[in-house]
Amino acid sequence: MIFGYVTQSDKVEKRISITPEIVKKLNKENIQVLINKDYGKNSNISDQHFVDAGAQVESVEKIYSSSDVVVQICFEDPETAKLLKKNCYLIVNHFNKNNKELESSLKSKNINIFSLDLLPRITRAQSMDILSSQANLAGYKAVIDSVYEYNKAIPMMMTAAGTVTPAKFFIIGTGVAGLQAIATAKRLGGVVSATDVRAASKEQVESLGAKFVFVESAENLETEGGYAKEASEDFKKKQEELIKQTIKNQDIIICTALIPGKKAPRIITEEMVLSMKPGSVICDLAALQGGNSAFSEPDKIIEKNNIKIIGYSNFASRISESASNLLAKNIYNFLELIYDKESKSIKIDMEDEIIKNTYVGESN
């Protein structure tokens, strides 16, 4: 079989879906690997490294037309879809079901699509979990980027000239990204507090040495999969008041609150932003989904009242070498599940929960 890997053409996405290490593994299974020119450039991997591992460098058109399996971070161009080999398999991080023109193009060629962001949260799928591996790095990078924009030292320093007080971090949302943000901020010497609508996250937050700030409520705001779900209006009002009182004393705020399939909840209002100390920084990981914070805009740093609001849309891509290494392993583990070594072909077992969840179907 031929597996083809193509980079994204947009400026924000710098990650790749395969590394030379994975190329070698696929070659051992008699799988031919094709990549486009400069495939690993943004992750500091030269074409020669890929070639030495056993990959072939081909044009994008050749890859699309000859590959039995095409792996790409995102696939959104209906015209490009026309280049794909009929009946091939398309594996992406996220498939946009609302792109009807793309859907029509893929359906006309009977393309089978897997969207890896739909992996179930079960133990067997952990090694394939692209959301967790990338969110972990995003939480780390969000803290690093925030510290870069912050104009003071982070840890407490006691010197002959006086004492430098530690920076105060407030983490909103304690999923994978939020927990890594807490851990990173603590390692840098910050004083960290965090909040989440899920009461169950209290233990995790405190185990990392942070203070948990929480609205007491009888509501269960956690899905069976462990994600946060939308709160009632009464809860939102209580949460808003709690955050309003907390936020004014913070130096750096990291926002990571997302609700799967919905617009990001607006947690920090304009009034809250303007109540913060001059020089403070807000880092909004949800900017692309509408933003947790007022004023945040995707891929921009906005300054209001001497307060910076960071809205990068893809924090994992900003640390692309590490992100690509983890992503490539996640995807390889998924490929191992659907590739049958005996028949040397892709086999779709719809009884398998992982395949059933991720299989978007024939562009359906």
In which residue ranges do the predicted regions lie?
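Glycine/threonine-rich flexible loop motifs
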Residues: 12-17, 79-83, 258-268, 293-294
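An N-terminal-biased, well-structured beta-alpha scaffold segment characteristic
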Residues: 1-109
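Adenosine-phosphate binding glycine-rich loop
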Residues: 117-118, 123-160, 166, 293-364
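Glycine/serine-rich phosphate-binding loop and adjoining beta1-alpha1 elements at the start
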Residues: 2, 8, 76-168
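A structured beta-alpha segment of the ubiquitous adenosine-cofactor-binding alpha/beta core
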Residues: 54-68, 76, 223-253, 257-274, ...
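Glycine-rich phosphate/diphosphate-binding loop of Rossmann-like nucleotide-binding domains
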Residues: 7-45, 153-246
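Rossmann-fold NAD(P)-binding glycine/threonine-rich loop
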Residues: 97-123, 262-316
